[in-house]
């Protein structure tokens, strides 16, 4: 998406649970951008080892980017970034694989 | 080690239909996907219509559909493949209907709309903007109810296994653990979709980085027509929307017309509010307005539905109007901005009408196959192609598998020993920008040469993954495939010194009769 010329740059601090601790990243964004945009920015600009899961990017079709943001279960692709701190955690009721990725495949679609 | 009669790679519509057809023909099938089964491909994102000569809205015949497909293809369709798409389409669409997909109906028959490039009302759909999700869900349910199909997600195929020049299965990595998984198969079907993730502006899922093309190429298969990348002209540009596919304005235009306007709020295509311009023509038209300084603020065009009342909008799109409102958009009061977006790839693996590639026992299905749509795909042909080619590939792969023994495969998969220090996520973003800028809808020799030079310097090595989920390895995997496929597109675009359909050379603007031929690539 292009940037309108007169749009102010905003900043969010994404506090991300990575195993037993949290790691914070300052993420610049434009009004309207999503948590998933922010996470993809972190991977390309700061830390490619950050594990996130998504497939369709922005259409809310694949349903793979579900996570907890500030204690609520949401899709990262439809949750807008807001200035200030946002706390990101993996789904609490699924087996943790890494960082924000949990085991979400139906049991009969996993490698046996 | 996994074993199956038929291995299907990719679980969009083509892969799932192939799995069902192969199982029905007596094979046991392993259906694998790098994402979740039936959720990660292109199909689930399709919000538009499906072209098929079922003749429910007005009399039709598949030969009329074929004539329109060949015309849209600008002289480059493989007529056998186009015919398969058009002739088998009605049977597949009716089978999907029996399976409960829920095609929209009017007065007791399937509703069909008139899409650009078709000579009549031919396109079925599922309301509201739900065609792709409904197709995916229907096939997923059929797959789940077929005990001969084993489904495994989170399994990315890194290489095809070749013995004596024939495909004998594949090597895969289980992404959550990093474990290597060899798969022996009598027949293998690549239903991995296209390559639109190569572009910064794309309507694809993350899985559409051309995996199948790269696998096939490294296995010795031929690719065809790689220069023909379709840009969908009116992909959403601004204001930012979330939770909507950028292709969503297509069904809006089918139903409501709409006016495509430049910065002077004038129509620049001969449409007069009708949705009639072919995709290549509209893409070119928008980019030329932008180049002339008459684009919208974000360098696209305006699209206006301000002629429609709230009631008309709600009748046509129901809950979608609320989702737009949640995004701050009121179509009765404001136009939105649109611009071309990479959407589909006409080229792909070269295959016969039996869907077998040039490597024996390796089949392809869906968008991964090149040729059916020539230089420009007709609206609505993609899902039809996925269903018909998937069904055919599944049947033919099963027929082959019934005749041959289970092959043995070498368990080692051959990763490189070095792990590059680059940030592969950043490199992918760089590649996408490069492709969008120089190998997009408007091309020149200078731009293509610059792109080729940069692409060839990018990292093409793939080390073994670390134990556990290794996101950087996944990016290295994708970068390796995307880089190879990007090189194919760029080299083919550089060699084709003419303009035709989706391939537009600014330095060779004319269509040349001498170029009415295919280019193939093999390594």
Predicted regions and their residues:
Chain B
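Glycine-rich loop(s) and the adjacent beta-strand/alpha-helix scaffold that form part
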Residues: 187-240, 295, 380-396
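N-terminal Rossmann-like FAD-binding beta1-loop-alpha1 element of flavoenzymes
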Residues: 6-31
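Core beta-strand elements of the Rossmann-like FAD/NAD(P) dinucleotide-binding domain
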Residues: 2-4, 178-187, 358-359
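Residue-level detector of alpha-helix initiation sites
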Residues: 12-13, 36, 195-196
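Conserved N-terminal glycine-rich FAD pyrophosphate-binding loop of Rossmann-like flavoproteins
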Residues: 35-68, 74, 233-234, 243-245
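An anion/pyrophosphate-binding glycine-rich loop and adjacent beta-alpha core
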Residues: 215, 221-330, 334, 396-403, ...
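Conserved redox-cofactor binding core of oxidoreductases
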Residues: 39, 92-179, 191, 235-239, ...
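Glycine- and aromatic-enriched mobile tails/lids
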Residues: 1-2, 25-27, 36-38, 45, ...
């Amino acid at each position: 998406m292009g940037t309108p010329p007169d749009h102010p740059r905003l900043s969010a601090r994404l506090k991300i649970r990575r195993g037993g601790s949290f790691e914070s990243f300052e993420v610049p964004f434009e009004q309207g951008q999503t948590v998933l945009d922010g996470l993809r920015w972190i991977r390309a600009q700061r830390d490619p080892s950050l594990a996130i899961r998504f497939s369709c990017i922005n259409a809310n079709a694949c349903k793979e980017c579900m996570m907890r943001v500030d204690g609520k279960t949401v899709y990262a692709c439809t949750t807008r970034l807001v200035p200030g701190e946002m706390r990101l955690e993996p789904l609490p009721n699924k087996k943790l694989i890494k960082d924000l990725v949990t085991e979400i495949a139906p049991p009969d679609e996993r490698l046996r | 080690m996994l074993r199956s009669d038929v291995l299907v790679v990719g679980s969009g519509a083509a892969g799932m239909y192939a799995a069902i057809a192969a199982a029905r023909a007596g094979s046991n099938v392993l259906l694998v996907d790098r994402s979740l089964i039936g959720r990660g491909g292109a199909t689930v994102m399709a919000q538009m219509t499906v072209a098929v000569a079922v003749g429910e809205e007005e009399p039709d015949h598949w030969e009329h559909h074929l004539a329109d497909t060949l015309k849209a293809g600008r002289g480059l369709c493989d007529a056998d493949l186009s015919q398969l798409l058009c002739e088998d389409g009605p049977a597949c669409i009716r089978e999907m209907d029996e399976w409960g997909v829920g095609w929209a109906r009017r007065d007791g028959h399937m509703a069909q709309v008139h899409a650009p490039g078709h000579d009549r009302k031919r396109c079925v759909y599922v309301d509201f903007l739900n065609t792709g999700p409904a197709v995916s869900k229907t096939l997923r349910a059929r797959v789940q109810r077929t005990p001969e199909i084993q489904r495994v997600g989170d399994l990315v195929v890194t290489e095809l296994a070749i013995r004596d020049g024939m495909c004998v299965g594949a090597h895969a990595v289980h992404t959550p653990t990093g474990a290597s998984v060899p798969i022996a198969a009598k027949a293998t079907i690549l239903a991995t979709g296209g390559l639109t993730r190569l572009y910064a502006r794309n309507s694809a899922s993350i899985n559409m980085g051309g995996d199948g093309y790269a696998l096939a190429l490294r296995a010795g298969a031929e690719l065809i027509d790689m220069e023909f990348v379709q840009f969908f002209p009116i992909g959403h540009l601004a204001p930012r929307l979330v939770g909507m596919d950028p292709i969503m304005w297509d069904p809006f235009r089918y139903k409501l017309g709409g006016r495509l306007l430049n910065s002077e709020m004038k129509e620049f295509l001969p449409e007069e509010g009708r949705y009639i311009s072919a995709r290549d023509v509209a893409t070119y038209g928008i980019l030329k307005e932008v180049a002339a300084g008459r684009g919208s603020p974000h360098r696209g065009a305006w699209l206006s539905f301000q002629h429609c009342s709230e009631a008309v909008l709600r009748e046509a799109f129901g809950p979608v109007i609320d989702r737009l409102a949640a995004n701050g958009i009121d179509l009765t009061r404001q136009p939105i901005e649109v611009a071309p977006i990479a959407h589909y790839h006409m080229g792909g693996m070269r295959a016969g009408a039996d869907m077998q590639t040039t490597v024996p026992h390796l089949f392809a299905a869906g968008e991964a196959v090149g040729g059916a749509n020539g230089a420009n795909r007709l609206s609505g042909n993609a899902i039809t192609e996925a269903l018909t080619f998937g069904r055919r590939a599944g049947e033919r792969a099963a027929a082959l598998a019934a005749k041959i023994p289970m092959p043995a495969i070498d368990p080692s998969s051959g990763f490189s020993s070095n792990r590059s220090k680059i940030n592969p996520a950043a490199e992918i973003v760089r590649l996408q920008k490069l492709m969008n800028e120089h190998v997009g809808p408007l091309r020149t020799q200078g731009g293509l040469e610059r792109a080729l030079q940069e692409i060839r310097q990018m990292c093409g090595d793939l080390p073994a993954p670390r134990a556990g989920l290794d996101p950087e390895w996944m990016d290295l995997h994708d970068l390796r495939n995307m880089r190879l496929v990007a090189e194919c597109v760029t080299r083919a675009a550089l060699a084709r010194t003419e303009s035709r359909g989706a391939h537009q050379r600014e330095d060779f603007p004319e269509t040349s009769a001498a170029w009415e031929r295919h280019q193939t690539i093999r390594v």
